[in-house]
């Protein structure tokens, strides 16, 4: 995962440097790197920070031939904290670009604030649908994806496989809604239930009990990071493999596999390429 992150962050950094038309050759390029470094969600943010630091080491601490400073900040996966940090990065630190941002609800919280300040905003992960297409801004660039894309692949796969009905589950925030919207765009079978869980939830016993009662032939789940680890482990402990086939996006991936180990066996998923998969 580090190799993958380094390539991504190096690309982001290099692209950003090319757009700093208002930075003189003598100036230091300042990058505000906002990610989640605390709590259960810190598993992904720590990987992003490690990748950025390794990329800067490979680049000799420079971007576009200029000295560069990367300021890391912890958004705590809280929109209000993200807004405060964005304000600090823009007004106090006077960064040339804000990047990072894992969570789509945080990207939605800071998007207008950053882009309207004429600061470049580059997403390393979050790709909420409202800021794509007609909602795209000239000061925003995404180096990852638009949230709907990966689940669209799973929706098509399950439609082509002839799966007649499915139970849906996702966290109740922007990316969760985008994921299920993307899935339903290509899957045309029966939706038995569409369940939204709390963002950051760690106990899924109530949801698994309801799912067991519904006994769907297939279940499609988006639960990223630590949520995915907890969900998959509890799914296994509850013996849910005998109840329903599990299909996922970002629940079983390079971030969660080290913790899941054999608990991931049996889950099917669509995913962007990773050396871990």
Task: Go through each PLM region and give its residues.
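Sec/Tat signal peptide C-region and signal peptidase I cleavage site
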Residues: 5, 20-26
